[in-house]
From Swiss-Prot:
Its EC number is 1.11.1.-, 1.6.3.1. InterPro entries: DUOX_peroxidase, EF-hand-dom_pair, EF_hand_dom, FAD-bd_8, FAD-bd_FR_type, Fe3_Rdtase_TM_dom, Fe_red_NAD-bd_6, FNR_nucleotide-bd. It comes from Caenorhabditis elegans. This is Dual oxidase 1. Keywords: Calcium, FAD, Flavoprotein, Glycoprotein, Hydrogen peroxide, Membrane, NADP, Oxidoreductase, Peroxidase, Repeat, Signal, Transmembrane, Transmembrane helix. CDD domains: dual_peroxidase_like, NOX_Duox_like_FAD_NADP. One of its GO terms (molecular function) is calcium ion binding. Residues 22-587, 1008-1024, 1090-1134, 1185-1189 are extracellular.
């Protein structure tokens, strides 16, 4: 019999393909269904809309499901629950039941999830025996709405239309798939066959094509996709029956291909494949349309005879068909499958568990193992013998209670899902759908009269649930109730028949269509003769005697009837449903990851503190890196009783110098390496000498510290080369102390403690400053003079018990200890101890000088000068006192001239030149024109300002009337705010624009992700979190782009010379850099925290949810990403964590405390910005949430940044030789080096300098203002030693000066722009320099006089310059005095006016100031206006400048000007005072305005 069947098939193939071949240019039917209908190419294609055969029924008419309808689960329990095992009265076999699933999967897949996921909840009745066994009433069955066309669902005229992801044609997509890549993965490309794994079976899914692979509910875990067979439909491995049909059709294709190849060996692989595919499709079309459909609907219902192809007929799957009618076969599916052995004997197999049938609920998504265990033959034979369930409303529990679901809800209800699918698709109610198909409406009683009679209570309950209104009855419920023993009811029959008719008539490639030229009439008749039985026999080892003629039905007399009607009795029980969260096992990783991220900045801060403390602990700092105790000196060894040792003296944290320590008898001397005493300490009889030294082996690099304390003076802190030197040093101290009975106390301490306790000269000075501030606050009764951080009252023992020495008093007054004025004042004041002065003693005398009447002050001065106590003062003693004051003030006149000036002053007061003594009356006459209350100086606050007589002559340039000076009220908040806005209007505008752009970018992205991005599931999963983080990302990208522009120093320098400089305050580029950095830190923090929350939500999502969230990513079907995956296994996660770490490192080491103490670390960590930008670019590349946009933000700034660096390299000058260097007072360093020929700059600009001789970390350079004029041949810099690098440079220069060795070479970059370079843009300019801030004006003033004294004067716009120099004492700036002398000598008459404000007298004695005024006034009057202090014509002022009065004077002097430039360089408080003065002056709208440019150090 087998041979007869093979012969028959061979004849069939010979008949069909014997007379012609398939040409290469012949049209092959597409896999995706497109262009089947040439007029409507998308009809029936994969991804096309479902066909709407009746109007949609949504509660809002657009897309909303009617939530007022009864619970789908409750309907399922009432109507579809029942006993299984009732045989089908028509004799339908299980083959028909499972083949209906093949047909459904062949033509539709409309339950795919849509993005965003729309999950509805099906309410479970209380105490449901499957889903609510504990009677909690909280369980809800999840239902996910189907994928739909995004172009629909937007209005009443365009209701939501779901999508069919399969083709509507019967075209073999169940076997081949719907895409070319999918088909290619299935083919062997040999002889037209589909690829095989083992013979007769397709390969397993090692290539991981996207087959459906949900977690089998019976094991409740994800399984590897490698175990699944690869076939055309992704759902084919769902159950054993479905997979068996898939394998049958797979073999049918290869069987056909073999036959065709045998007949036509010359055909190509593609020709054979397409020919075999044609026959497979044709045979499926015939079996489905003419065998299956009548079998399902009943023999009396058949499709009409085929007439012709009808291109106007839409083949699309209708909503009513897919969501209701074609779900009727659920009622005939049995709970288990019989397994029948091959052979002539009628034997059935028990499954491996000993159960008589294979339970369906226990084998979801395990079909491949069943097939391999029992074979396709046994499954097919079992289904052929097994009678299906009866055609009724009952659905077995394997489908109704235990069908597979997602992992978080492992079992679902297929009936409830079908009801919800109809509602989701907008299928109209039962009666309305009947009217659409020309059927009369039904009532509750007539819907199924037999059912109503038998189950009246159920119908009544149903009626109650729908409120008695049958107009709301779901079509699926009504259609299922219509059915009976003869199959589906009339509504479902009409829908199914209509659907298959449209599919057939609208298919251009239908096998009966004569116009497509595929088959002849004879070939069509031959195809009509093919049955499913023929295909089974051709593809299995089943003999024809084992199968009935019609495998869809089992009739009496057919071979091997079933032994029993399968029901749930005696079968393997179903594993109950389980609920779980996808967050399981993620808690620990998530919590510890967040803790780790939070600890990153703390760790960075800890590392920074460790670096700083370690340097302190081992006494290591950059100032002593290159210094050792091994240096040459004039007296290296001990001479006689003199002990000597080389050491390093630790003066302050960033300054260490080489010294020679010598101990002779009871004196310890600190000397310079080549001679010269720096300090002497004498040990007194009975003195307690305290010594602290480092613990043994404190540092292998430098050796131990020694601290020697001294009362009323700063400690001596030295570092010896070794512990051996330390031992010898201590022995010498003990020996010196033993001779005078002094007690020596020696203790060892850790370096960090020792250095922190050391009262260095700097720390002692801070304490003295506090001492004097508090005393002045008491004396002047002015709380503003107090330390803002120290609270002082009369009970503060720490201050009251403080004493100062004569040397410290002299230093505070700016005098020397041997100064006559100091000696006399100290002798008169120190009453309890001749060596020290207490706080109360100092306060008493201070009050006398400040608050006492003028008469009492003169008496005090008279007592100081009356050394003999005879109530008269020796003329020469008073002369010596005045001479000491002049010497302190730095008077630049000889002693003879001073004596002449002194005699002139006395003569002016009426004292005879012959008088040897002066009486008190002479003193009174001498100071008669001095006010009783004279201000200390010109304070910044401008309160109660009245120029004194002495000041008036010195302040004649400022003699203006100020209406508000005498009656100025305290500044209100509004006044301060308005002054700030007036001063910083450009800055405020720029910052406002910056903030506005940040907010616009943030809210644009926020709005987009919160309200617009509906095609993703972001909003449902993450809520506002994703909107916040994406908004922060947009603003952060902008900040990171902008921050690059703020450091393009070379480009900024070029822009300063353009009109842009008038609108953008480039002076504040670094300040703006910090503002942008703070905003970036805020956005980055918000972004990071937001995503930490977001990824928690991501970790709770199913695979479908993740597919919607991350549409650009692909996850394996057996892979559910954990939180550790997101954090540590994705580019986004890893780069995100790396970015947090890098950003924390950069920001932490950019804190001022680390910049000051660990500058190298700051420089190095800022190089991580390169990695920061690279990581940020990588961060967005995976496109998890959106396409990366960071590159669009930064591409322009990066290009400009690179151009800026190229310009910088072009302006990089290496190994410049220092030709001259000096160490000036106040720790100022002067260097002069050769100017490169091509180096051009403007006065007021600055350069960055580094030196290869100073061992610094990579790329360290420091900025300094240029002191030389553009016309000079050499470059000059004046550098204040304040940090590690400058102190190290100072030490190197000292070494070179002492040893005569070459100066260190330097590298230079620049020049860079500065606000001071704009002075030439104004006709009137005001320049204010304070401290080392006068450096840029050394260049500017020289440039000014050289320009104005040359023939090109007419090219210089500037016509008047006011220069104000604010300094504590000009003695420390002799170099600048020389510059001013040179400027005065060359300046054109009237172009430059200079004022010098000496602030050291502020908080000092007004008596001293008064005497200086008197001498200065008389000297100027007799020496052509030259100052006796400076030798300059510049006016001297004792106190601080009153900028408000000065600016008002300038406005009155230059009314014709519209704008006047103000340039300042100095400390913050100076610039703030100038800015405030400018703001006040700018309120005068009819006067010139002031434009302030400043530099702060």
């Amino acid at each position: 019999m087998r041979s007869k069947h093979v012969l028959y098939i061979a004849i069939l193939f010979s008949s069909i393909f014997g007379g012609k071949g398939i040409q290469q240019n012949e049209e092959f039917q597409r896999y995706d269904g497109w262009y089947n209908n040439l007029a409507n190419s998308e009809w029936g294609s994969a991804g096309s809309r479902l066909h709407r055969d009746a109007r949609s029924y949504y509660s809002d008419g657009v897309y909303s499901v009617n939530n007022s309808l009864p619970s789908a689960r409750e309907l399922s329990d009432i109507l579809f629950k029942g006993e299984s095992g009732i045989p089908n009265t028509r004799g339908c076999t299980t083959l028909l039941a499972f083949f209906s699933q093949v047909v459904a999967y062949e033509i539709m897949q409309s339950n795919g999830v849509s993005c965003p996921l729309e999950t509805l909840k099906i309410q479970v009745p209380l105490c449901d025996n499957v889903f609510d066994k504990e009677c909690e009433g909280k369980t809800e069955i999840p239902f996910t709405r189907a994928k739909y066309d995004k172009a629909t669902g937007n209005g009443l005229n365009s209701p939501r239309e779901q999508i069919n992801e399969r083709t509507s044609w019967i075209d073999g997509s169940f076997i081949y798939g719907t895409t070319q890549p999918w088909v290619s993965s299935l083919r062997s490309f040999k002889q037209g066959r589909l690829a095989e794994g083992v013979p007769g079976y397709p390969p397993l899914n090692n290539p991981h094509i996207p087959l459906n692979n949900p977690a089998p509910p019976q094991v409740h875990r994800l399984m590897s996709p490698d175990r699944l067979f690869m076939l055309g439909d992704s759902r084919v491995n769902e159950n054993p029956g479905l997979l068996s049909f898939g394998l049958i059709l797979f073999r049918w294709h290869n069987y056909n291909a073999n036959q065709i190849h045998r007949e036509h060996p010359d055909w190509t692989d593609e020709q054979i494949f397409q020919a075999a595919r044609r026959l497979v499709i044709a045979s499926m079309q015939k079996i489905i349309a003419y065998d299956f459909v009548p079998g399902l609907l009943g023999e009396d219902v058949r499709l009409s005879n085929y007439t012709k192809y009808m291109p106007h007929v839409p083949p699309g799957i209708s909503h009513a068909f897919g969501a209701a009618a074609f779900r009727f076969p659920h009622s005939i599916v049995p709970p288990a499958m019989l397994l029948r052995k091959r052979g002539n004997k009628c034997e059935f197999r028990t499954e491996v568990g000993g159960y008589p049938a294979l339970r369906l609920c226990q084998n979801w998504w395990n079909a491949q193992d069943i097939v391999k265990e029992y074979s396709v033959d046994e499954i097919i034979l079992g289904m052929a013998s097994q009678i299906a369930e009866r055609d009724d409303n009952i659905v077995v529990e394997d489908l109704r209670d235990y069908i597979f679901g997602p992992m978080h809800f492992s079992r679902l209800d297929v009936v409830a899902s079908s009801i919800m699918r109809g509602r989701d698709n907008g299928v109209p109610p039962y009666n309305e759908l009947r009217r659409t198909f020309g059927l009369a409406p039904k009532t509750w009683e007539t819907m199924n009269e037999d059912f109503y009679k038998k189950h009246t209570a159920k119908v009544e309950k149903l009626k109650e649930l729908y409120g008695g209104n049958i107009l709301y009855l779901d079509a699926y419920v009504g259609g299922m109730l219509e059915g009976g023993e003869n199959g589906p009811g009339e509504l479902f029959k009409e829908i199914i028949k209509d659907q298959f008719t449209r599919i057939r008539d609208g298919d251009r490639f239908w096998f009966e269509n004569k116009l497509n030229g595929l088959f002849t009439d004879e070939e069509v008749q031959m195809i009509h003769s093919i049955t499913l039985r023929d295909i089974i026999k051709a593809t299995t080892d089943i003999d024809e005697t084992m199968l009935q003629k019609d495998v869809f039905f089992f009739k009496e007399g057919d071979p091997c009837p079933q032994p029993f009607q399968v029901n749930t009795t005696g079968l393997e029980p179903c594993v109950p449903f389980m609920q779980s969260t996808y967050w399981t096992d993620n808690d620990t990783t998530y919590v510890f990851t967040l803790i780790g991220l939070a600890c990153v900045p703390l760790i960075c801060y800890g590392i920074g503190r460790y670096l700083v403390n370690r340097r302190i602990a081992i006494g290591h700092n950059s100032a002593c890196d290159s210094l050792t105790t091994d240096f040459a000196n004039d007296d290296c060894g001990a001479k006689g009783d003199i002990y000597g040792v080389n050491a390093l003296e630790w003066l302050q944290e960033e300054y260490i110098r080489q010294v020679r320590i010598e101990i002779e008898n009871t004196t310890l001397a600190v000397k310079k390496p080549r001679g010269g005493i720096l300090r002497k300490i004498r040990f007194e009889t009975g003195q307690k000498i305290e010594l602290f030294h480092s613990m043994p082996n404190p540092s292998a690099m430098h050796g131990p510290f020694v601290l020697l304390s001294q009362k009323n003076n700063h400690h001596l802190v030295i570092r010896l080369s070794s512990d051996r030197d330390l031992s010898k040093f201590l022995d010498q101290i003990r020996q010196a102390a033993s001779g005078i009975n002094a007690e020596v106390i020696i203790k060892d301490e850790e370096n960090s403690i020792l250095l922190s306790q050391a009262i260095t000269k700097e720390r002692r000075q801070d304490r003295l400053d506090l001492f004097f501030r508090e005393a002045y606050a008491k004396a002047f009764n002015d709380s503003e003079l107090q330390d803002s951080e120290t609270s002082f009252d009369s009970s503060n023992d720490d201050i009251l018990n403080e004493t100062i020495s004569r040397e410290e008093l002299a230093s505070a007054m700016g005098m020397k200890a041997n100064n006559e004025f100091v000696k006399r004042m100290f002798a008169m004041t120190a009453k309890h101890n001749e060596d020290s002065l207490s706080f109360n003693e100092f306060l008493t005398v201070l009050r006398e000088f400040v608050n006492a009447p003028q008469k009492q002050k003169l008496q005090t001065l008279f007592k100081m000068c009356d050394l003999e106590g005879k109530n008269k003062v020796l003329r020469k003693d008073l002369a010596e006192l005045v001479k000491s004051l002049n010497q302190t003030a730095g008077v630049h006149i000889t002693e003879s001239v001073q004596l002449r000036l002194f005699n002139e002053v006395l003569h002016y007061a009426g004292v005879s030149n012959d008088a040897k003594y002066l009486t008190y009356d002479d003193f009174n006459a001498l100071f008669s024109d001095i006010p009783d209350k004279q201000p200390v100086g010109l304070p910044f606050n401008r309160k109660n300002y009245q120029p004194s007589i002495g000041e008036t002559s010195s302040l004649n340039s400022f003699a203006v009337v100020d209406r508000s000076i005498n009656s100025s009220a305290p500044l209100t908040l509004i006044h301060k705010v308005s002054a700030f806005l007036e001063t910083y209007r450009q800055h405020v505008f720029i910052v406002f624009c910056f903030v506005a752009i940040n907010l616009v970018l943030f809210f644009e992205r926020f709005w987009h992700y919160r309200y617009m991005a509906e095609n993703r599931d972001l909003r449902r999963v993450m809520g506002a979190g994703i909107a916040i983080t994406r908004g922060a990302a947009g603003a952060l990208s902008f900040c990171m782009a902008l921050i690059l522009l703020t450091v393009c120093r070379n480009i900024i320098t070029l822009l300063r010379e353009t009109v842009i400089a008038q609108y953008i305050p480039f002076d504040s580029a670094i300040a703006f850099h910090k503002i942008v950095a703070l905003f970036a830190a805020f956005w980055a923090t918000l972004h990071t925290v937001g995503h930490c929350v977001n990824f928690y939500h991501v970790g709770t999502q199913s695979q479908e949810g993740l597919a919607c969230l991350f549409q650009e990513a692909f996850f394996g079907s057996n892979f559910l990403p954990s939180i550790s995956y997101w954090f540590f296994s994705t580019i986004t996660g890893l780069t995100g964590i790396a970015l947090v770490a890098v950003m924390c490192i950069i920001y932490v080491f950019a804190l001022p405390c680390f910049i000051k103490r660990a500058y190298h670390a700051f420089r190095l960590t800022h190089l991580l910005n390169i990695a920061f930008y690279a990581l940020t670019l990588l961060h967005g590349l995976p496109k998890l949430l959106d396409s990366p946009k960071f590159g669009y933000y930064v591409v322009g700034p990066i290009v400009l940044f690179v151009i800026d660096r190229i310009i910088g390299l072009m302006q990089y000058y290496k190994k410049l030789e220092i030709v001259n260097a000096e160490i000036l007072p106040s720790d100022i360093i002067y260097i002069e080096y050769r100017r490169p020929r091509e180096f051009k700059y403007k006065s007021g600009q600055w350069v960055t300098v580094s030196s290869p001789s100073i061992s610094c970390t990579f790329n360290e350079s420091h900025a300094f203002s240029i002191a030389s004029s553009p016309q000079d041949e050499n470059m000059k810099l004046y550098i204040k030693a304040v940090g590690p690098w400058t102190w190290k440079l100072r030490s190197e220069l000292i070494r070179s000066l002492n040893t005569g060795s070459p100066f260190p070479l330097i590298h230079m970059k620049g020049p860079y722009g500065d606000g001071n370079q704009e002075w030439m843009d104004y006709e009137v300019a005001i320049m204010v320099g304070a401290g080392i801030g006068v450096t840029p004006y050394a260049s500017t003033l020289v440039d000014l006089v050289q320009r104005t004294s040359s023939d090109s004067f007419h090219r210089v716009r500037c016509r008047k310059v006011y220069f104000l120099w604010v300094c504590s004492t000009h003695k420390n700036y002799e170099w600048f005095v020389d510059v001013l002398k040179n400027v005065e000598d060359q300046a054109r008459s009237g172009i430059l006016e200079t004022h010098i404000f000496v602030t050291q007298t502020f908080h000092k004695f007004d008596l001293r100031t008064t005497m200086l005024y008197i001498c200065e006034k008389h000297f100027r009057a007799t020496n052509s206006g030259i100052s006796m202090f400076t030798g300059l014509h510049a006016k001297n002022h004792f106190g601080r400048p009153n900028f408000k009065a000065f600016f008002q004077f300038i406005q009155s002097e230059h009314k014709e000007q519209s704008k006047i430039g103000v340039f300042s360089c100095g400390p913050v408080n100076l610039n703030e005072s100038i800015a405030e003065g400018c703001a006040d002056a700018n309120r005068q709208r009819d006067a010139p305005s002031f434009a302030h440019r400043f530099e702060t150090f």
